[in-house]
Amino acid sequence: MFYAHFVLSKRGPLAKIWLAAHWDKKLTKAHVFECNLESSVESIISPKVKMALRTSGHLLLGVVRIYHRKAKYLLADCNEAFIKIKMAFRPGVVDLPEENREAAYNAITLPEEFHDFDQPLPDLDDIDVAQQFSLNQSRVEEITMREEVGNISILQENDFGDFGMDDREIMREGSAFEDDDMLVSTTTSNLLLESEQSTSNLNEKINHLEYEDQYKDDNFGEGNDGGILDDKLISNNDGGIFDDPPALSEAGVMLPEQPAHDDMDEDDNVSMGGPDSPDSVDPVEPMPTMTDQTTLVPNEEEAFALEPIDITVKETKAKRKRKLIVDSVKELDSKTIRAQLSDYSDIVTTLDLAPPTKKLMMWKETGGVEKLFSLPAQPLWNNRLLKLFTRCLTPLVPEDLRKRRKGGEADNLDEFLKEFENPEVPREDQQQQHQQRDVIDEPIIEEPSRLQESVMEASRTNIDESAMPPPPPQGVKRKAGQIDPEPVMPPQQVEQMEIPPVELPPEEPPNICQLIPELELLPEKEKEKEKEKEDDEEEEDEDASGGDQDQEERRWNKRTQQMLHGLQRALAKTGAESISLLELCRNTNRKQAAAKFYSFLVLKKQQAIELTQEEPYSDIIATPGPRFHII
């Protein structure tokens, strides 16, 4: 941890500083004044227990915060004292006598003012209502499309039949213009009409009124039932070229009847015209004469009546109601809480401590099955040595077994594996015998450059090894001895017979390991084989039941003890000072050789023998140790 427990304790010397660094709001004004910064800084500089740099940094932050708050409180007290002093010693303030301690009534009472409630209300004309409403009103030209209003075709003479329609006769129908003016004023707004008006239009309107007064009682145009104008202008039947919606007829129906014009035709209600006031007069533009203009009269009038635009209300998305989710389980049982408190599996892991020493760490790294079967017992950093070691680990399959495997002579896999794992295969015996012959031939090739004594010694050893009788008949070993030819031995024996015999003492040979007589060790080997079988059975039982220490003691008591006694008898009889493991393991299978090698290691551990090896993969020489004759 980067902090010490004494820092976090409530009564510790740095408790308030630690609290100020991590929870500043928890400190009160009393805590700030009680904190002694000098002692705290000294305890941070020279702490009783070693603190991490991170802890000291946090404590310095707490010191700075406490100092800041102390300075702030001091400044506030100074300001308050300054204000009080300033208020107490104001210039010109005199202490009041006892008579004037009570203030006057007029000084502390507000005067009562009664206003006149009979005042007239302000004039409504003073309030500019239009200005208030025009703030949010757009200009007509900006929001309205300009439309070209055509001329009234009925005002032009078209010489239709004998019905002479001159200007004076048409102007008698002044009521038609008046009614049409009412229609336009009631259905459309004056804002949609152009404001520019010429003086000629006003004069023309005055002439219309004069003609109407003169010929009011003329009754011209009565009895025109079924007339051309009546059929074309008043009829509401469909089929017109520009007859879209009947908006004009509806507006004409809604107009009230006027009693001043009782003698007027039905055309007066539908005919067009301008309003009475000059403000609403429609400016008429001259248009060229067109054919069949009578059918276009109602359609042109419809251009004035714009259809009302639907008010588009902005649709707002309805807020989706929140669905209230209520838990089915509202309370936790005490059993559930206890189970959660007792369950600490997520914060606890298995304890995996590293070995205390480097040697144990190295053993742990290289003690696995993968490393034991792929690397030697000692660290080899050279790649060549590792290749040599791995080359010895690869088994050589005999050729006859390969042929049998390819030819399918093996009955099943178990038989093939048994034959492959059998250490007494002729192939291995032949290889061992070839190695023996190589060992025998090497000194013979180098003999001419040595003295005669060395030649005699080598010949003696060769004679002893060649004269060694074969081991007792045991299956394949006897056959291997018969099959093994020895073409080199007869010439060696001939050369040895020609050399004069020289008597040599047994102590003089340089390599006494080769003088170990195999005849004396044969009965011991047979006994060892029988005992090894018994030991194997006992070891299997011990693996299932006993401990490791008991197994090691039993192995030492039986197999290793027999090896030690055999070595003692061999060295006593031959007088040799050392024994070769390679010579001791001749004519044995792999299991027996491994057992002897293991016995050598146990004896070396018990200081019964000393082992020496000149180079890797060379022969191991055993010499008596300090406890060779004691055990």
UniProtKB/Swiss-Prot annotation:
InterPro entries named among the record's database cross-references: NXP1_M-like (IPR049589), Rad21/Rec8-like (IPR039781), Rad21/Rec8_C_eu (IPR006909), Rad21_Rec8_N (IPR006910), ScpA-like_C (IPR023093), WH_DNA-bd_sf (IPR036390)
Presence of keyword Transcription: yes
Post-translational note: Cleaved by separase/ESPL1 at the onset of anaphase; this cleavage is required for sister chromatid separation and cytokinesis. Cleaved by caspase-3/CASP3 or caspase-7/CASP7 at the beginning of apoptosis. Phosphorylated; becomes hyperphosphorylated in M phase of cell cycle. The large dissociation of cohesin from chromosome arms during prophase may be partly due to its phosphorylation by PLK1.
Basic and acidic residues: bias regions: 423-440, 522-532
Residue ranges of the region described as Interaction with NIPBL: 154-171
Keywords on record: Activator, Apoptosis, Cell cycle, Cell division, Centromere, Chromosome, Chromosome partition, Cytoplasm, Cytoskeleton, Developmental protein, Disease variant, DNA damage, DNA repair, DNA-binding, Intellectual disability, Isopeptide bond, Mitosis, Nucleus, Phosphoprotein, Repressor, Transcription, Transcription regulation, Ubl conjugation
GO biological processes: apoptotic process; cell division; chromatin looping; chromosome segregation; DNA recombination; double-strand break repair; establishment of meiotic sister chromatid cohesion; establishment of mitotic sister chromatid cohesion
Cross-link (Glycyl lysine isopeptide (Lys-Gly) (interchain with G-Cter in SUMO2)): 48, 216, 418
A GO CC term attached to the entry: spindle pole
GO molecular function, one term: cis-regulatory region sequence-specific DNA binding
Record remark on domains: The C-terminal part associates with the ATPase head of SMC1A, while the N-terminal part binds to the ATPase head of SMC3.
Subunit structure, as described in the record: Component of the cohesin complex, which consists of an SMC1A/B and SMC3 heterodimer core and 2 non-Smc subunits RAD21 and STAG1/SA1, STAG2/SA2 or STAG3/SA3. Interacts (via C-terminus) with SMC1A and (via N-terminus) with SMC3; these interactions are direct. The cohesin complex interacts with NUMA1. The cohesin complex also interacts with CDCA5, PDS5A and PDS5B; this interaction might regulate the ability of the cohesin complex to mediate sister chromatid cohesion. The interaction with PDS5B is direct and is stimulated by STAG1/SA1.
PANTHER family: DOUBLE-STRAND-BREAK REPAIR PROTEIN RAD21 HOMOLOG, SCC1 / RAD21 FAMILY MEMBER
Protein name: Double-strand-break repair protein rad21 homolog
Annotated source species: Homo sapiens
Gene, per the UniProt record: RAD21
